[in-house]
A protein has these predicted regions:
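Active-site phosphate/pyrophosphate- and oxyanion-stabilizing loops and adjacent acidic/basic residues
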Residues: 81, 120, 156-159
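Rossmann-fold NAD(P)-binding glycine/threonine-rich loop
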Residues: 135-168
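Short gly/ser/thr-rich secondary-structure transition/capping motifs
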Residues: 31, 87-94, 113-117
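Rossmann-like NAD(P)-binding element
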Residues: 96-126, 130, 137-139
Length: 169
């Protein structure tokens, strides 16, 4: 059998297959339909956002527009006054630990290099919750830990930094 006759598994193909498998597992671990339906009927979810810059701020505004309760957070929450005003009466701001406690769902929107510290600092508040990690490792910004995350797989690395959460990547 020649090399051209063999099925060649590319990195991209492998990662796509792994991604589909991971998505299937993530969906299987989502709350029961009754829980989601109850939250939907109530009209809103309580969402805590750790990191309210460009990404966290923009997503939070959209969620607020959809009627959800939003807790924006930053190490400098006094700088979020304008963002909270834009988001409306169901929005508030404070420190990251308060956002982690507040949210039924938590969005982490910080540089990937900060993820290990977020996990160490707020793991108890986020335990068992759906946590959305929207960061991506970049070696130029995040240093050697980015190389490690890329090599192991970002989802695997993130799960290690955020123990006990229901991780969405």
């Amino acid at each position: 059998m020649s090399t051209s006759d063999k099925e060649c598994v590319t990195r991209r193909g492998f990662l796509q297959s792994a991604g589909f498998a991971a998505a299937g597992l993530a969906i299987a671990r989502l709350p029961a339909l009754s829980e989601v339906t109850a939250a939907h009927r109530s009209g809103s979810l309580r969402i805590g956002i750790i990191g309210s810059g460009r990404m966290g701020g923009a997503v939070g505004l959209k969620w607020a527009e959809a009627g959800h309760e939003i807790f924006f957070s930053s190490r400098n929450p006094d700088q979020l006054t304008e963002l909270v005003a834009q988001a409306g009466p169901k929005a508030q701001a404070g420190l990251p630990g308060a956002a982690a406690s507040f949210g039924e769902v938590v969005l982490i929107a910080v540089p990937y290099g900060a993820l290990p510290q977020v996990g160490r600092d707020y793991a108890p508040q986020m335990r068992g919750k759906i946590v959305i990690d929207c960061g991506n490792p970049r070696a130029d910004r995040d240093g050697p830990m980015a190389d490690d995350a890329i090599e192991r797989g970002t989802g695997v690395a993130s799960a290690g930094y955020l123990p006990g959460v229901r991780l969405v990547r």
